[in-house]
Amino acid sequence: MRSLGANMAAALRAAGVLLRDPLASSSWRVCQPWRWKSGAAAAAVTTETAQHAQGAKPQVQPQKRKPKTGILMLNMGGPETLGDVHDFLLRLFLDRDLMTLPIQNKLAPFIAKRRTPKIQEQYRRIGGGSPIKIWTSKQGEGMVKLLDELSPNTAPHKYYIGFRYVHPLTEEAIEEMERDGLERAIAFTQYPQYSCSTTGSSLNAIYRYYNQVGRKPTMKWSTIDRWPTHHLLIQCFADHILKELDHFPLEKRSEVVILFSAHSLPMSVVNRGDPYPQEVSATVQKVMERLEYCNPYRLVWQSKVGPMPWLGPQTDESIKGLCERGRKNILLVPIAFTSDHIETLYELDIEYSQVLAKECGVENIRRAESLNGNPLFSKALADLVHSHIQSNELCSKQLTLSCPLCVNPVCRETKSFFTSQQL
């Protein structure tokens, strides 16, 4: 039972659902790069971010012509309203790509029902729901507008959102794409760094859809399954880091320690050969190269739960350790997240940058703004799709290689599905 509890907690963390009760915050629509100075809280809310988010409402895409190319933007998603929380948890606990539980079909509904009230309260206190759909819609709108200019031969382009655990579900998005009569479909993960528990699960859902309905796709599928070192992605991260460094006192700026924080993984997953740690490290290395190694830095890992070994060092322990060693000016950079959600808005902004920082005696701590509505990020997405179309490749070479100790037979079927497509 101890192992079972650890698996359940790990699953919640992997889906970005915090088990702890968050403090009240203003809203998830506002990125809050908090700074503590001499133990006193000085909340610095980025006005530009707030303006972006206020205008980032999902809109129906105007279609003057029948879409020719569809881009399916894949993500786990998050409950958009409090009423979505139960179904979100239920689908999460039923996902065998994420975890395997005994009598899962019976245990999952029990766990979801038991957890729903507490999770609803958490989302209520950060604005009533997750911002992932809002930001994905805004990013998709910018992406397809640019794509129509970059690649007129494959236009019109239309983006579709495919979430694993909330509407619009991946399966619902595929059905809409089939109804639209697309010629080309691109499964585009919104996780820059590949993991079997995130991108892998979303790609498996596409394979399972066609396997269950018993028919072949009417459109030609390919996938952008990872993009950890894309030059515009790296530029976005570098720009946001430089922007936050400017807020530190001039005399302290060169001493600021940059902590790149990514969601951790259990070592049992890593030791099967999941490429996630290497790809996150590659992103960090490229960002620091772009910054010409302007400051000392470390890659740290957040959201560990349970007694089992996870990737380390942990973000909170790293903050404590740095303070104990006299390094009290810290910049947190969420390097594996492209938009704000509960792990940035609560875990980084409140738990670490307010509560923990005050306890440790941090002088200055800030968090780099997430990519959210940055126009350069939409340009990055468009460039990735455009380059993918021009390459005429079905997927990356890495996707053709299974983890050396993979235990999920569906992964092999999914790889076969994508590599057997004809463009």
Swiss-Prot record:
Inhibited by nitric oxide (NO). The 2Fe-2S cluster could act as a NO sensor. Changing residue 236 to Y: In EPP1; enzyme retains 12% of activity. Residues 1-54 form a transit peptide. Its cofactor is [2Fe-2S] cluster. Changing residue 406 to Y: In EPP1; enzyme almost inactive. Changing residue 267 to I: In EPP1; unchanged activity; but increased thermolability. Binds 1 [2Fe-2S] cluster. Protoporphyrin IX binds at residues 115, 123, 130. PROSITE patterns: FERROCHELATASE. Its main location: mitochondrion. The keyword Hydrolase does not apply. It is a peripheral membrane protein. It catalyses: heme b + 2 H(+) = protoporphyrin IX + Fe(2+). [2Fe-2S] cluster binds at residues 196, 403, 406, 411. The active site is at residues 230, 383. Changing residue 139 to L: In EPP1; enzyme retains 18% of activity. It comes from the Eukaryota. NCBIfam families: hemH (TIGR00109). Catalyzes the ferrous insertion into protoporphyrin IX and participates in the terminal step in the heme biosynthetic pathway. This is Ferrochelatase, mitochondrial. It comes from Homo sapiens. The gene is FECH.
